[in-house]
Structure formats: C-alpha cells, structure tokens
Amino acid sequence: MLAKRIIPCLDVRDGQVVKGVQFRNHEIIGDIVPLAKRYAEEGADELVFYDITASSDGRTVDKSWVERVAQVIDIPFCVAGGIKTIEDAEKLFAFGADKISINSPALADPNLITALADRFGVQAVVVGIDSWFEKETGKYWVNQYTGDEKRTRQTNWQLLDWVQEVQKRGAGEIVLNMMNQDGVRNGYDLTQLKLVREVCNVPLIASGGAGEMVHFRDAFTQANVDGALAASVFHKRIIEIGELKEYLYAEGVEIRR
C-alpha cells in the first residue's frame, strides 16, 4: 500500500504566498522560497504551488521563483497556473518542477490534457478541479478562473462527469479543490470525496477544509484519498507537519515519517 501524502499548498500572487477563504479576500502570508524550505524541512511529502491569477490574467506561471524553489527543496513539487501549451510545461520542468497541474486551461481545451500526458507521461500531469456545491439543487459544479473572483464562472460540467472525462484524456492525478470548504477549517467534504473516489481510478488529493488533525485522518480512512492538501493550518502553524504525521501513524494511517 502506498503511503498517504501530506501536501502543503502555496497560493502565489505577485511573487508572494497568499491565502483566502472560499477563494476570496486573500491575505499575504510571506515569501515563497523560505516557506517552501520550511515545509520541506518539516516533513512535507510534496508541495503544490498555484499561481492563482495566471489563468484569469491570461499569462503563464511566473517562472522566476520556480527555479529558486527547486534549488532549496529536495521533495517533489507541482506547479500550476495558466499552463496552456507544451512549451509552457517544458519551461517549468526545465526549471525543476516535478509535475504540472492544469485547471482552467483544461476546461478551455480538454485536448491539452492528452497532449501533455503524451509528451511528459501521465505521472507528471495533474488536473485540478474547483468544485462548488449548489445547495438548492444538490449538484456539484465545476468552476473556472477561480483565481479572480470577478472572472470566476460556473461551467456546464458537473463534477463526476468532468472527473471521468479528465481521466479518459490522460490525467495522472486529480486535486479536488472543494470551494465551499476552502479556508473555513471545518473539515474536508467527505460526502463529495466519497462520490469522486467511486469514479476516480488515479490518485486523488483532497483540498479545502482542513482545520484539525482528525480532518486529515477522516479523509484518508473514510474517503480513501491518496493525499491531503492544506494551506492555512500549515501557514499559521495551527498544525505542525511532524506532529500530524505522528498522529496519523498512531491512528493506523500508512504515512512516511
């Protein structure tokens, strides 16, 4: 059985790490490189960097910090933000990224997933999905351009359909960003994760809602996700990664320590 992964997420805007609540009202957390180094030293299994306004601004990831991060950490890291072409991805891999993640550009052109998977291998291609639960209808919708609240739009894709579509096209991993839960720290949406897990045959990473150690345990044991991604609880030292891993190990979760 593969060890479960603990993944700090760093949302990047204008060269700094920021964090919002439900993808809005972002506050500055600090500089990218020292934070990345800290997480690697504290025992993170992997890091994810989202250049959150790249897609909505119509540009690709600001590459200047990617190379600097690669120089100071020795764990895998994934980069996302406005990657629309093979060339965009090639540059990020050349600077040291281990994986790239696409989200809004995949919705704009689903063939991009296949092109990237064919060129770099499925193991290097992650698809991020921003889901929104519509209480009135009980449906989960996929949103696009969520890095800019003025441009965020609901697509015509329902969540489970899109999860199946991206797998057919070559996604090697899915990060599910559950927008209703984002930054509110009251737990991952286990109902949603279980629904996605039933149709997801590639590694599934939960994102949005972690506030306590038990939330990580529940995502792993109840929804059988492969990794749990979190931001504010790590940025604000509400949870220390080393302590979290000891707790999960004691709770019977297969984890790298």
From Swiss-Prot:
Origin: domain of life: Bacteria
Listed InterPro entries: Aldolase_TIM (IPR013785), His_biosynth (IPR006062), HisF (IPR004651), IGPS_HisA/HisF (IPR050064), RibuloseP-bd_barrel (IPR011060)
Catalysis performed (reactions): 5-[(5-phospho-1-deoxy-D-ribulos-1-ylimino)methylamino]-1-(5-phospho-beta-D-ribosyl)imidazole-4-carboxamide + L-glutamine = D-erythro-1-(imidazol-4-yl)glycerol 3-phosphate + 5-amino-1-(5-phospho-beta-D-ribosyl)imidazole-4-carboxamide + L-glutamate + H(+)
Pathway: Amino-acid biosynthesis; L-histidine biosynthesis; L-histidine from 5-phospho-alpha-D-ribose 1-diphosphate: step 5/9
Gene Ontology BP annotations: L-histidine biosynthetic process
Catalytic residues, chain numbering: 11, 130
EC code: 4.3.2.10
Record keyword Repressor present: no
Its biological purpose: IGPS catalyzes the conversion of PRFAR and glutamine to IGP, AICAR and glutamate. The HisF subunit catalyzes the cyclization activity that produces IGP and AICAR from PRFAR using the ammonia provided by the HisH subunit.
Record text on subunit structure and interactions: Heterodimer of HisH and HisF.
Protein name listed in UniProt: Imidazole glycerol phosphate synthase subunit HisF
